């Protein structure tokens, strides 16, 4: 949404028509009808290939992002950035391995979690319980090919 708000053109791949329609409705609700001029959701499977070229950025939220890396290599422009959300560190490690074997560099993985804090007067500490779901974000940059 932030990129659309800033004026970027966004192309998404979705294998389910109902999810594609939901995505468009969400964009319209958040940014208005005009934003849909720059937002395109294609009914395609990224595992089978990516036809478009010269993407600046690619964000992956799917079970096996490492399977898309060879396609991303041809779809991203030189210096383009790829990012994947993975719920497990094993997935993040497999994704990193695929990136290393396909010309990507500056690879970094970070864990994302949410922890609340107790702040009352001078008593400042993390809450005793943390009910959280962690996730891992791995990003890299495509080197010149």
Where are these regions (language model features)?
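Conserved SAM-binding loop of SAM-dependent methyltransferases across substrates and taxa
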Residues: 1-7, 73-74
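Short hydrophobic alpha-helical segments of the AMP-binding
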Residues: 3, 27, 99
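Short beta-strand element of Class I
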Residues: 7-13, 82
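Conserved beta-strand segments of alpha/beta enzyme cores
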Residues: 9, 38-40, 105-108
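C-terminal substrate-binding/active-site "lid" region of AdoMet-derived donor-dependent transferases
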Residues: 66-136
């Amino acid at each position: 949404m932030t990129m659309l708000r800033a004026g970027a053109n966004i192309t998404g791949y979705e294998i389910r028509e109902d999810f594609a329609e939901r995505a468009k409705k969400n964009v319209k609700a958040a940014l208005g009808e005009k934003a849909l001029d720059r937002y395109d959701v294609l009914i395609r499977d990224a595992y089978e290939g990516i036809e478009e070229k010269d993407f600046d950025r690619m964000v992956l939220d799917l079970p096996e992002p490492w399977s898309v890396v060879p396609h991303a290599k041809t779809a991203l422009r030189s210096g383009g950035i790829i990012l994947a959300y993975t719920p497990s560190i094993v997935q993040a490690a497999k994704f990193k391995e695929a990136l290393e074997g396909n010309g990507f560099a500056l690879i970094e993985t970070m864990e994302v979690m949410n922890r609340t804090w107790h702040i009352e007067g001078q008593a400042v500490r993390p809450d005793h319980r943390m009910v959280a779901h962690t996730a891992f974000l791995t990003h890299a940059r495509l080197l010149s090919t």
